[in-house]
């Protein structure tokens, strides 16, 4: 009976309209039940009654369950598939783990674009744990719902931020997150390009790295965030989540950071706020130099000033006059700058 129920559930999921799957993911709250009727009405241009009929059918099929909310009515996505495995890192082959333990189920629950992103990101992050963590084992867990899939990879190694700080001789583990956000960072330049974590973070809808007392959070279309945690996390935990019927392709992710007619990683976005440690303001040349480390590896660098209200004159001058003059081959562009910040940049460039 259990196998029959699983087969029936699989059939319902395979027949699920991709648009409904995307609505479930876009309106899904990992912690609380979510109202869905209005989202379906707006997406489909249908009445509340018609949206309720769709939701009632999804409940009967076992794809979602009703939450406690009444006005508006709320729903939760059912977990349809889970799998967890703990493996030794020594001798591990990431493509074998993917193809034997996870791809068979993933391929039944999602579209080709999502599957391609999972194959890339899963194997890149697992390879990173195998070759760089200095750990002995990794635990991999997956959770598939009607709208989305999540994977956790938890190794018992040194910790990614601690390792980067040690090998790259950085003064603070928080700067390791800033360097990861730029891309082209590797602790083994002879064998790795430093692109795997960067592109994995941008391929998935949601991506988090937790290690030590820090958490790095990247969400598609949102700003990068750095959270400081009270509780230390040994090793490195990477969480990835992605819509089962995403319309974004892996090629589009790569193209966003490449020059036209080129196939190289030549463009990056630097979240300026990650150069700010604690409550400090961004006023000094040394803080600007945190941002500028290694940006000469790119042709175009976008400095994203989201969540930064103001900067000091020395900070702006170091980036947009001093560095720009010394590196004319690198195009520096500010984005999301406030009028005050733009004024500081204009003042700096006027002095060149």
Regions found by a protein language model. Give the residues of each.
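A structural signal for short secondary-structure junctions
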Residues: 232-234, 294-297
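A short acidic, amphipathic alpha-helical/loop segment
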Residues: 199, 290, 318-319
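Conserved beta-strand-loop-beta-strand hairpin that lines the nucleotide-binding pocket
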Residues: 29, 65-85, 129-251, 322-324
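A short acidic (Asp/Glu
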Residues: 220, 312-317, 343-345
